[in-house]
Amino acid sequence: MKLLNAAEGRWRLDYNCVANVLKDTEYDIIPAKKKEEREITEYLLWLGIILGKRDYLSFIRGITPAAMILLEKIVETLTEVGDIKKYCEKRKDTYWLTRNKLEQSEIGKEVLDVLDKRYGEFTDCIYTTAHLELIIKEFCSDDKIKSHYLKIIRKTETELRNPIAHTIVAVDNGMIKNRIGITAEELYNDVIKKVAESVRLMKKSTWNSYDEMNKLLIEKVREVK
């Protein structure tokens, strides 16, 4: 069944597969149409599916891309800094935050001052969530973002994701709550989802996208029988 093959491709984040399989059908299972928006939306939904399977190890290992997505959008939408890539040079497939780019605007100079204070003298590098954290703390006026969501996201990276990233270890909710103070489900539902909606990455209705796809699959399978 084409729809089943497309669903499997979606699970693998293979959008070309989905498009090719469904191109001559009436089905449309991916809500976001623009490439960047689609990649972000589908990744966050995929994390939720992983969590639903209680695959806590894969969920935590998948946090860094999600953290980067969320923090980039916080900087872009909730600070006057805007798109962090404006201050970067693209080198092959990576974005390097550079002094030269930062020095080209007043707000860039303010960002550079923050980075210099933290690192002694900031040197050009691929930007990370650690850099975005500094920018958000300095330029974001949303106290809940700064004092709650940002803190949990970065704590998840530094105290949970990074230590287990390259080790063979069993991960359960007991470990997760012990290290970051909340369960994996609370992290996803009360932090990731809330931030994604706050920065207009996701609509509330989009979170049900996989459920809607699964209902459609069940309907079509029953029709075949």
Language-model-detected regions and their locations in the chain:
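Charged, helix-rich terminal subdomains or tails
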Residues: 14-16, 25-26, 106-110, 114, ...
